Structures are given as structure tokens and as C-alpha cells.
Amino acid sequence: MTRHHSAPRNLPRAQLYAERAFATLERFLHVEAVSGAVLLAAAAIALVWANSAFAHSYHALWHAPLSFRLGSYEFAQPLHFWINDALMTLFFLAVGMEIRREIHEGALSNFRQAALPLAAALGGVVAPALIYLAFNGQAPRSAGWAVPTATDIAFAVGVLALLGRAIPGNVRIFLLALAIIDDIIAVLIIAFFYSGGLDYSGFAVAALGIAIVLGLQRIGIGTAYAYVLPGAIVWTGLLMTGAHPTLAGVVLGLMTPVVPRRMREQPLEMMSRATRELAGWYQAQPAAESGAPTLPLRQLRVAQREILPPVVRVQAALHPWVAYAIMPLFALANAGVSLDGVDLAAGGSHWVMAGVAGALIVGKPAGVIAMSWLLVRLGWCRLPPGVTWGGIVLIGLLAGVGFTMSIFIAMLAFAGDANMLGAAKLGVLLGSLATAMLGLAWGAIYARRLRGASATRGTAQAPDSAHS
């Protein structure tokens, strides 16, 4: 049988440039330091915009109504609601999936491994809450006790990434585990303390959405698009209950499978067979143009999708949207505090600002370091390999970068008091910026010490190798 091989064609130069640019952009979007910088830039723009001559346009934009109509039914809410209560659900979905992965195979997969980050996280919640309450023990200021207890994963890890590879990998893993536990605690705080009176009829709607998700998983539906509608039902149900609807993201994230679904033919086998069929088809075809068979192409797409666990696949798809669209948009919509509009003398608002900032700068690092030291001192835990006390200090400082999550909790705590909300946001911005700068400064010292210790070990080993 005669085999026909079509001659390779040179790709157009424009296509080559486009492919290289896309590959560069894709690598760029997965650099954690870049996402932190984008988040910081969005917050800075919001702050400048809200205090400029165009401040009216800033507030008018976020209060502009956005509605959805279906027949005679209309659901209208300001743009601010759609960002904070709808888009942020995707952020919490990513958080839920990160928690699910860590419980399955990461730093939270066994208690012995998770004990020290868990204790550090608890210390990093209790200490700042107590420091805040020391400044603000009376209502309504006391409602903000949870504001400085949170850690912004993206911002904290982004700052750590700026320090480069001199920082041991286990420091990053410890910080991630601590921040994830912090997020779990923050979600529980939102659910129990900031959800208001609950209308239990909404739980039936949320339960229906969860049942549909379980049913789709049971029959082996792998495409993420099939879960959009039941996810929306869960979100609507939680909104009806009075609980914060973004918790739907956490629920769905924790339900996302961490292993590939079972198939009659394994993805690699399907991919190999479909590739052989396509190769045979191309060899059998003359140079004349004709469409490739659709079945092997469809099987290749399915195999490519199913070779990864759903939690990894969805997380990878969500990451650029969450890091470069949703979180910066949240910062842009919420970090714009009008300095003229905040009267720090009214109602003790200056104590709210001081309490939040002081709790993030002092309480968060102190709680993380003290609890870690206590458990190691008692012999209940050991520091992870490669992590020294200098690394724990760095983790404690970066845990004080509350930013996104702290602003989110502040908006729930002071929903009815714009002045105290503004003061709390100022405290979050000042505290987060201060701990980030302190973390960078200490991280540079810590990295230099590690390099010096490594060089000393290398010098000490050199004479030994010469004598051997």
C-alpha cells in the first residue's frame, strides 16, 4: 500500500509570534508575585480614584444597578453586590478546592503534618482578635473583632515569591497550610457570626442543588459546565437563607472530586488508540484536503480532559480569572476609602482603625510565633525540615497580610455604618502594607543568613574532601 506523507508546511511568521506571545503570557499569569502586584495596583488605583476629583464617578459606578429579567421576574442589585456576593463565590470555590486538595494529599492530609500549621493558625486568629477587642471592647466597634484574623493567600504568597528561591520550599508549604486553615476559620466565622437571622426554607433549595451535584457525579458527568446550574441553585438557596451566598463556593469546592473518574477505557489508552486511528487515517489519505474523522478527535478531547482529577483541572482553569480579574476587581470596588469621608473622631472610629492595624502588625505574627514555639517547646510538634525560627517569623509577618479577606469581613461586620467601615478598611490597608513591607525586609535578612550558612557548610566540607 502506498503511503502518502504531506510535506511539512512552514507556519506563517505572525502565527509563530502569536504562539510565542501566548506561551509567554501563560507563564506570566502563573507567577504568584505578579498576581500580588496586580492586586496591590488595583487597591492603589481605588484609593487614588476615591480621593480624586472623580470620586463621585467611583461611587456611582459601584452603585449602578445591574438586573436580570426572565419574563415578569426581575432580580436587580447594584454592581457592588454582583462583585462581592456573586463573583467572589468563584474565589471561594478556588479556596474550597485548595482545601480539598490539601486534605487529600497535601499539608493537611494527616494530623501530625497539619498540627503545627493548625496551631499557628489558631494562634494567629486568637491573638489579633484579643488585641482588637482590647481597643474596641464596646459595641458597635466590637463587631469588627474578626477583621484582622484573616490572611490573604494570594497576597501573602505573592510577597513570599518576591524573595526568590533562597527561601526554603517548606516555608511556602507552611504558609500555604496556615493560610488555608485561616480561610477555613474565616468561612466558619462568616457562617456563624455574620450571616444574620437564617430563613431555613432556603436550605431546601441549597440541598436540591447539592443533590443535583451528587447525582451528576454519580452518573459520571465530567464536564464542569454541567455543574454551573446546580451551583447557581446552591448559591440562590444560601442567599435565601440569609447566610452569605459566597459560602456556596466553599461547599462546591469541597465536593469537587480529587481523583479522575472511572471510565471503561482509561484516558491514556483512549488517547493512544485515538492517536493510532488518526495516524492511520492521515497515512491513508492523499494530499487532497478532507476533514479528519470526528470520533477520534472527540475521544482525544475527552481523554485530555479526564486524565487530570477534576479538582486540578477546574482549579487550573479558574486561577487566572480569580487572580487577575475577580480579586483585583474586588479590591478596586472595595479598597476605595474616601479619606475626607472618614471621621476618625466620630464614635471611636480611630480605635477601629488602630485596632485592626495593630492586630495585623503585632497580633498576627505574635500569635503564629507564640503558638508554634509553645507546641515545639512542649515536644508535641517539630519544625518542618529546612524551616528555622527565622522562617516562622517570616510566616508570621506574611500571615498579617489580611487585605482581601479582611476587607470582606469588615464589610459584613460594619454593613450599617459607613464611617466605621471606612476606618476598618484603612486599618486593613495600613496593617497589610506594613506587614508586607516588614515581611520583605525580614525575608531579605533571612535569605542572606541562609546563603551565608550554606556557604559556611560548603567551606567546611571542602577540606574534608581534600583529605579524603
From Swiss-Prot:
The chain crosses the membrane at residues 28-48, 79-99, 115-135, 143-163, 173-193, 196-216, 219-239, 240-260, 317-337, 356-376, 392-412, 426-446. GO terms for molecular function: sodium:proton antiporter activity. Signal peptide: none annotated. Pfam families: Na_H_antiport_1. Keywords: Antiport, Cell inner membrane, Cell membrane, Ion transport, Membrane, Sodium, Sodium transport, Transmembrane, Transmembrane helix, Transport. GO terms for biological process: regulation of pH. GO terms for cellular component: plasma membrane. It is a multi-pass membrane protein. It is found in: Cell inner membrane. It catalyses: Na(+)(in) + 2 H(+)(out) = Na(+)(out) + 2 H(+)(in). Coiled coil: none annotated. Belongs to the NhaA Na(+)/H(+) (TC 2.A.33) antiporter family. Na(+)/H(+) antiporter that extrudes sodium in exchange for external protons. This is Na(+)/H(+) antiporter NhaA. The gene is nhaA.
